[in-house]
Design a protein with these regions (language model features):
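Boundary/junction segments of secreted and surface-exposed precursor proteins
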Residues: 15-39
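Beta-strand-rich ligand-recognition modules
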Residues: 111-139
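Surface-exposed, low-complexity/disordered Ser/Thr/Gly/Pro/Asn-rich loops and linkers
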Residues: 48-84
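Bacterial Sec-dependent N-terminal signal peptides
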Residues: 1-20
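Short, surface-exposed loop/turn motifs at beta-strand boundaries within globular domains
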Residues: 25-27, 48, 76-80, 91, ...
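Aromatic-lined ligand-binding clefts that engage carbohydrates, nucleic acids, or primary amines
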Residues: 32, 55, 85, 91-112
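Residue-level detector of high-confidence beta-strand sites
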Residues: 37, 60, 117-118
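Short, tryptophan-glycine- and acidic/Ser/Thr-enriched carbohydrate-recognition patches
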Residues: 34-50
């Protein structure tokens, strides 16, 4: 099965086939596609079939203003980030965990479905919408 993961800044998904170990399907430093929007992006940007070939590419973690970012971005309100991964046998997965480090808010999607959010209000956030609070990345 092919999956699409979309969210802000440094993200890793962890899966485990048996309780005795975890496997990461998205690794730190993996290449992602990203968009620094000047207007609202296409409404299907978070769908698997969306063609993001015109977006920029960079390795995770994304950010600005400190020395821990692999892909340095200009100061911006929002960034849209996409990555794909493949799971060959979904039947062996008992759970998936989203682990991310972010400033200041995020909305995460998996195959077009929202799976997590923090400090971002509204059903579909606007590209120029600031977060609802402050959260400093820990890494």
């Amino acid at each position: 099965m092919r999956y699409l993961s979309l969210f802000s800044f440094f993200v890793s998904f962890l899966t485990y086939a048996q309780i005795d170990h975890w496997e990461s399907v998205v690794l730190p430093g993996d290449q992602w596609q990203y968009l620094l929007p000047s207007s609202q992006p296409n409404s299907n940007w978070n769908q698997v079939e969306f063609n993001s070939s015109s977006w920029d590419s960079g390795n995770s973690g994304f950010g600005y203003g400190d020395a821990d970012d692999t892909t340095v971005l200009p100061s911006t309100i929002s960034v849209y980030i996409r990555s794909t991964f493949t799971i060959t046998d979904a039947s062996v997965i008992e759970a998936m965990v989203l682990d991310l480090d972010y400033d200041d808010g995020f909305v995460a999607y998996l195959n077009g479905q929202e799976i997590a959010r923090n400090l971002v209000s509204g059903s579909v956030p606007n590209f120029d919408q600031a977060s609802d609070g402050n959260h400093e990345a820990m890494l």
